[in-house]
Amino acid sequence: MVSPSAKEVDMPIDGGYVGMVDREVFDEWLRARAERSGATRARGTFLRIDRDAEGDAIVQFEDKDTHQPVKVRTRMVLGADGARSEVARQAIEGGREVPFVYAYHEILRTPATAPAKYDGSRCDVYYQGELSPDFYAWIFPHGDTISAGAGTAHKGFSIRNAVGALRRSAGLGGAEVIRREGAPIPLKPLRRWDNGRDVLLCGDAAGVVAPASGEGIYYAMACGRMSARALDRCLRTGNAHALRAARREFMSAHGRVFWVLGLLQRFWYTNDKRRERFVKMCRDPDVQRLTWESYMHKRLVRRQPMAHVRIFFKDLAHLLGLAPT
C-alpha cells in the first residue's frame, strides 16, 4: 500500500494467497465448461426481451457473425451482462439506478528486467488523490503481463493520464502496452434482482462487487451459484417468489461485509489526509491479521475480541486526528 506522501506499508499474507486471474483465459474456460456440460452457446449482443401471446419471454439478440436478429423462447432469463446491464434496465425495477466507479487499466508486457519498484509476487495499491480522487490505483502482476489501472466516479477526472503517471512512478513508463480496457464497477447491490416472474440478475449486473476493494470475480461466481439454485427452484415449483432467494441468500452471506466496506470507502477514500491515516493504520499487525482473515474467508472475523478492541481505539484516534501521521 502506498500513501499520498509515498510512504509504503507491506501487508504480507499469512497462511494463504491471493490468486490473480487472467480474464482472457478464465472467461473462455468458463464458457467452454458450460458448453461441455450441455449449454448451447451462441455469440451475439443482447437486444431486448419480448413477450409472445402466452406471455413467455422471447430473448432477441444480434448474431455476432451474421449481424441478424435471433429470437429464442425461454422460460427463464438470467442477466449476467455486466454493471450496465441491459437486462436490468429493461426488466428490473430500479435497474437503471446503479451507482458505479469507472475503472480503466492497461495490460503491459512484463519487462525482461523488472524495475526496482516492481515485485512480480506483490500487488501494489496506491491511495493517492492525484491518481484517483475517490478510489485507488493499482499495479497487479499476472506473470507475463501486468495490469496498471485506476478507478474513479468523478466524470471530469482524466483516468488515462492518471494511469500514465502511475506507470512512470512505478518504472513501467516504457513497458509495451498490449491492450487498454475500461469498464464500470458497481458500488452496491441492486435492491431488486428479479422481476417477480421470469427474469433474474447475477454478478456485476446485480451490483455484487465489494466496495473499497472492487473485488468482483469471487462474488460473481458465488452469486451465479445462488442464482442457479433459485432458478432451479422456480422451475421445479412454478413459484416465481423463489427467484427472490438469490438476493436474500447472497446478502445474508455477504451483506454485512459489503456494508462495512462501503463505510470504509466513503470515509477513508475522501481526501489525501484521510488516505494517509488509512495507510498508516494498515501498518498495525492487528489490522493486517483481521483484514486478511476476513478477506480470505469472506466474512467478518468474530473471534479475537481484544484485537477488535485495540483496533477500535486505534481507529478512534485516527478519526479524531489524535494519532500521528
Spell out what each predicted region is.
Residues 33-176, 186-193, 207:
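Predominantly flavin-linked oxidoreductase catalytic cores and closely associated redox partners
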Residues 1-33, 54:
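A conserved beta-strand/loop capping segment in the N-terminal third of enzymes
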Residues 15-19, 93, 216-217:
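Short glycine-enriched, charge-decorated loop/helix-capping segments at active-site entrances
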Residues 174-181, 240-243:
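Flexible, glycine/charged-enriched surface loops at secondary-structure junctions
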Residues 27, 101, 160-163, 260-261, ...:
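A general structural signal for well-ordered alpha-helical segments in protein cores
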Residues 146, 189-258:
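Conserved mid-domain beta->alpha element of the FAD-binding
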Residues 232-325:
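C-terminal helical "tail/cap" subdomain of flavin- and related membrane-associated enzymes
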Residues 4-5, 51-58, 72, 193-197, ...:
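A short, glycine/Asx- and small/polar-enriched loop/turn
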